[in-house]
């Protein structure tokens, strides 16, 4: 899929729209956002030798989240909360953890509200309300050999993440949101022992379930206003895009 035209259009929208009255305290009170958030768990031990085609292949997602954000008047701070569904996969999904989380956090926007680009720093907490424990044994046969894997998963009840992000306002009240956080699990761990049919040695894997999380989504601020400047900026961007194309 060629994403270059979409990227060009987004950049044109950001550069063309007037921002003088984009985000003053009268026009931005609260917001909702919807995101997709793939994650990459940290693995602290992997004893599997290179001779086996068995890379860890950790990952997860795209996970889904939805939040409500309240902007504290006359400050650059906000409070945010919502729901995050997160799946962490190990061994391409042979071992996984499914988390349903209540998210609570805060953000600091340190640039002028008149800027179309709004970077922020913050802290997020994730409270897991789903089941925590899972254990079992699975086996697999394939072109790279047969193996048996015993695993144990203890999902964290709480994760804490420093975050850095950027809101890119395409219109007065609509922004593209990009966010990175390192989610540190409290009392979480995943472990496994893998034994190959041709090798009786058990190979261990361990993860504290800390993970990198990159989120991309759409934010809408309220009261919602679609201004004449937004219409003009959209038309100018489309005409410029068509001309460049």
Please tell me what each predicted stretch does.
Residues 22-71, 217-245:
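Short glycine/proline- and aromatic-enriched beta-strand/turn motifs that initiate or cap beta-hairpins
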Residues 31, 76-78, 116-118, 165, ...:
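Membrane-spanning beta-strand positions in outer-membrane beta-barrel proteins
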Residues 32-40, 81-85, 121-129, 166, ...:
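Transmembrane beta-barrel strands of outer-membrane/channel proteins
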Residues 41-47, 88-94, 130-136, 187-191, ...:
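Outer-membrane beta-barrel proteins
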Residues 48-53, 95-99, 136-144, 193-201:
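Flexible, surface-exposed loop regions and adjacent strand-edge segments
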Residues 67-145, 156-160, 211-212, 217-224:
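Gram-negative (and chloroplast) outer-membrane scaffold detector with strong preference
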Residues 171-245:
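Predominantly the C-terminal beta-signal and adjacent terminal strand-loop region
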